[in-house]
Regions:
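A short acidic, Gly/Pro-enriched loop at the edge of an enzyme's catalytic core
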Residues: 91-103
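A short SAM/SAH-binding and catalytic strip from SAM-dependent methyltransferases
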Residues: 101-115
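Short alpha-helix
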Residues: 161-177
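Conserved alpha-helix/loop element of class I SAM-dependent methyltransferases that forms part
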Residues: 16-36, 46-50
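A short glycine-rich, Lys/Arg-flanked "PGG" loop and its adjoining helix->strand segment in the class I
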Residues: 116-131
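Conserved class I S-adenosyl-L-methionine
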Residues: 133-155, 160
């Protein structure tokens, strides 16, 4: 991990991920989590204030970046919620099979290097009746914006921690063996269109 990724990127991501439009999106999905919860890519812990502590019996936070885990731990203390941290990547989840009731993924799929492998790992640890709550940005539906996304993405990935702009959220989920039960979409207000097309909702493992 280079100097930029270790020391400069974490505070930048912390600020961006704490923006009001993104916070509003988090509030739409995180409170639904219940039981034993696995959050993929906890980052600096921006979801933590929105968990319903009366519904969550155990919270596991997967976050490979040590500086982000430090920020998340501080935020967990402020929120009064316990978190069991693991530094593994989404592709390498080391939890027992069928042990998770809810998976929470917000603004994370865009940075995962091997999405199919991560989807397989996530599905393995989910109980048969478990749900995935997701809120992600991705490929825009209008071609004009999508063209700009494709042009910008090579540079964007280098400065934004490997963030991809052109991943279609619905296709990632269905190709990964999930069935979308509910999904809404919109362009986030106050956000550049190339990074602002959001999809959020709930998915389950396909039969």
């Amino acid at each position: 991990m280079g100097f930029y990724d270790r020391y400069i990127l974490p505070p930048l991501l912390n600020k961006v991920m704490g923006a009001k439009p993104i916070e509003h999106q988090r509030r739409k999905v995180v409170p639904e989590a219940s039981g034993t919860v696995l959050e993929i890519g906890m980052g600096a812990g921006h979801n933590l204030p929105f968990y319903d502590k009366s519904r969550v019996s155990r919270l596991i936070g997967l976050e490979p970046h040590p500086k982000m885990r430090e920020r998340a731990a501080a935020r967990a203390k402020e929120a009064g919620i316990g978190v069991e941290f693991t530094g593994l990547k989404a592709e390498d989840i080391d939890l027992p099979p069928a042990s998770i009731d809810t998976v929470v993924v917000t603004y994370t799929f865009c940075t995962i290097p091997d999405v199919p492998k991560a989807m397989s790992a996530i599905a393995r640890v989910m109980k048969p009746e478990a749900t995935m709550l997701f809120c992600e940005h991705g490929l825009a539906p209008d071609e004009k914006t999508a063209k700009w996304q494709r042009r910008i993405e090579p540079v964007w990935k280098r400065i934004a921690g490997g963030c991809h702009l052109c991943r279609p959220v619905d296709r990632m989920l269905t190709d990964g063996g999930f069935r979308i039960e509910r999904m809404e979409t919109m362009y986030l207000p106050g956000t550049p269109r190339f990074a602002g097309f959001n999809s959020w909702g709930k998915a389950v493992k396909a039969a």
